[in-house]
A protein has these predicted regions:
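Extended, composition-driven regions rather than compact fold-specific motifs
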Residues: 1-205, 231-388
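A broad, structure-centric signal for solvent-exposed, well-ordered loop/edge residues
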Residues: 200, 214, 219-220, 251
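Hydrophobic adenine-recognition pocket in adenosine-nucleotide-binding enzymes
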Residues: 210-215, 247
Length: 388
């Protein structure tokens, strides 16, 4: 069989891994039967490679066009079941001996705490798993849609955390429900924070990971978790400020909202002070009172400045735009200065081969695009603040 024909045959037995993988958080047998509890991963390339396309899942046979990989977690303990469902099999000889992807073993490697593969045995364990209780120190509780939620802090010294951390990771947010007089916990999300040294005698916590599971997203849990973590570190005099490791766009939106909400009540961020421009006093008070670093403080200032800016007043609006664009232009000015240094150090042919600098017109267009995107983001943040 030629390569083209093999590709045509294989195409029937491929599907995107984001579609094939199906998660469920379950508490009892009926949850396993409830398709409404199912959700898919947003990203799976960490498991299957950048293409995130699955082919065969069995050494001797390919499964037919539909196959589903089920990953069920007990909502509290995260006891895990992994299973495969498919419509039928195709002999691998049909595709000229092309070897299948070892999907089950690939996933199993990512679960050091292990997975169950017998569904009946998994179901039989659920009543015992219902006795799960969160570990660590209770920091905060709140209600959302008549359901109670609790946030716990745990670290490497916390009993039971090591095994649990292998299944998840550590500021832990749980849903708390009562059924038939019994309390049941279900994991909602988590945040991992590492502490680094800050010269000369301080600590700088760095938020490394944050996740709110899909069934609980868009309900305000992310803001509750971040506010709780911020409050925890604000009380520690050893903490200089809080940073974030490589934040995603969604996390930046959340952080901007939470920090703007916190800063708007500080005297230094009063409308009068905001209109006078960004100041060192803002940086100092935001760091002292809320552990917000200078870079984030500037973003918060811009959000609150736009909030008090009369967009129908041409001069006010222009002043705001220029202030933001000047900040956005700083990296370009630094790049220009670096290019000038290279021009002195390198030979003409070396310089022309290594140095690239946008034209003034290109830079202006790019800055304008950056500004428009940022203003739109700031406006959405302001709308969310107004809704509180």
């Amino acid at each position: 069989m030629d390569v083209h024909m093999v590709d045509q045959v294989l195409a029937r037995y491929k599907c995107g891994s984001n579609t094939a993988v199906r998660f469920k958080l379950v508490q009892c047998h009926k949850d396993i039967l409830d398709n409404g509890k199912e959700f898919h991963p947003s990203f799976s390339h960490q498991f299957f490679g950048d293409k995130s396309i699955l082919t065969a899942m069995n050494i001797s046979a390919f499964y037919s066009a539909r196959y589903d990989l089920h990953l069920y977690y007990h909502g509290g303990s995260l006891l895990t079941y992994m299973g495969l469902k498919h419509d039928g099999e195709v002999n691998s000889k049909v595709v000229d001996g092309v070897q299948p992807d070892p999907v089950l073993s690939v996933i199993a490697e990512k679960y050091p705490a292990g997975c169950m593969t017998n569904l009946d045995e998994f179901i039989a364990k659920l009543p015992e798993e219902a006795k799960f209780m969160p570990m660590g120190e209770l920091l905060h509780s709140y209600k959302c849609n008549d359901t109670e939620y609790e946030i716990y802090k745990a670290d490497v010294t916390t009993p039971r955390l090591k095994d649990y951390h292998e299944r998840l990771q550590t500021f832990l947010l749980f849903e708390k429900r009562k059924e038939a007089g019994d309390t049941h916990y279900s994991i909602v999300g988590y945040m991992t924070v590492y502490q680094y040294y800050a010269y000369p005698d301080k600590i700088r916590p760095r938020i490394s990971q944050m996740l709110i599971l899909p069934p609980f997203q868009k309900q305000g849990h992310g803001a509750q978790l971040l506010l709780t973590v911020d409050k925890f570190y604000v009380q520690d005099p050893q903490v200089l400020d809080i940073t974030v490791e490589d934040p995603s766009y969604d996390f930046m939106r959340l952080r901007d909202y939470v920090d703007a909400l916190r800063c708007r009540d500080l005297s230094v961020f009063s409308p009068e002070n905001i209109r006078n421009g960004f100041s060192d006093r803002m940086v100092a008070q935001a760091r002292k009172e809320l552990k917000i670093n200078k870079v984030q403080c500037r973003r918060v200032y811009e959000i609150l400045r736009l909030r008090v800016t009369d967009l129908s007043n041409a001069e006010e609006y222009k002043s705001f735009r220029l202030g933001v664009k000047n900040r956005l232009n700083v990296p370009f000015q630094k790049e220009k200065a670096d290019i000038e240094k290279l021009k002195v150090l390198l030979k003409p042919e070396e310089f022309s081969a290594t140095a690239t600098l946008q034209s003034t017109q290109e830079r202006i267009q790019y800055l304008d695009q950056l500004y428009q995107e940022l203003e739109e983001h700031y406006k959405k943040t302001i709308e969310r603040i107004a809704a509180v």
